[in-house]
Curated annotation (Swiss-Prot):
Name of the gene this protein is made from: mtnD
Source domain of life: Bacteria
Protein name: Acireductone dioxygenase
Binding site for Ni(2+): H100, H102, E106, H145
Listed InterPro entries: ARD, ARD_bac, RmlC-like_jellyroll, RmlC_Cupin_sf
Sites where the protein binds Fe(2+): H100, H102, E106, H145
HAMAP family the record matches: Salvage_MtnD
The protein's annotated pathway: Amino-acid biosynthesis; L-methionine biosynthesis via salvage pathway; L-methionine from S-methyl-5-thio-alpha-D-ribose 1-phosphate: step 5/6
EC number: 1.13.11.54, 1.13.11.53
UniProt similarity note: Belongs to the acireductone dioxygenase (ARD) family.
Length: 176
């Protein structure tokens, strides 16, 4: 289950499922929690995946992917894996942490590990959505954000795209 840290004066932490869901809905961010128990144990917490294993992950969650894709018009998906074994991980993370937006939704489903989306709220205040296995998030178009890893520095996620080309980041001049 995701948690949210709001970067206001109080550094408000939202931890209950109801609080998280209500806050994200108010921000226009889609949040779902999929049944991660469907994932075969041999793929849980595995970060060096073969193409066949990535395809298997997509097959395991095919119904959920098809459901959200039909509702939102998504056309393609892939699986990415990041860990300390990933070549140039620090360079990749530095690039991911550049604040940007897209002209379409940025959708991720966390399979293993953890990730953080830092998102600019409607009031201009940033908040971190700390994602765990089973969490799906869809950041709406034109919302400033960035993605990074949590302290464990590893994640396997399904990325779902509006186009077959994937997202095109539009970087901002101002830093977050």
């Amino acid at each position: 289950m995701a948690t949210i840290l709001i970067h206001n004066e109080e550094n408000t932490l939202l931890e209950s499922e109801q609080e998280v869901a209500a806050y994200l809905e108010n921000q226009g961010v889609i949040y779902e929690h999929w049944d991660i128990a469907k994932l075969p144990n041999r793929l849980s917490e595995k970060y060096d995946l073969t193409d066949e294993e990535k395809d298997e992950i997509l097959t395991v969650f095919q119904k959920e992917i098809e459901s959200i894709s039909e509702k939102r018009g998504y056309k393609s998906q892939d699986v990415i894996s990041l860990s300390d074994a990933t070549p140039n991980l620090d360079d990749l993370l530095q690039n991911f942490q550049r604040e940007h937006h897209h002209t379409d939704d940025e959708v991720r489903f966390i399979v293993s590990g953890h990730g953080i989306f830092a998102i600019q709220g409607k009031d201009g205040v940033f908040f971190d959505v700390r994602l765990n296995p089973g969490d799906l998030i869809s950041v709406p178009p034109h919302i400033r954000h960035y993605f990074t890893l949590q302290e464990d520095r590893k994640v396997v996620s399904v990325r779902i795209f509006v186009t077959t080309e994937g997202w095109v980041p539009i970087y901002e001049e101002e830093t977050v």
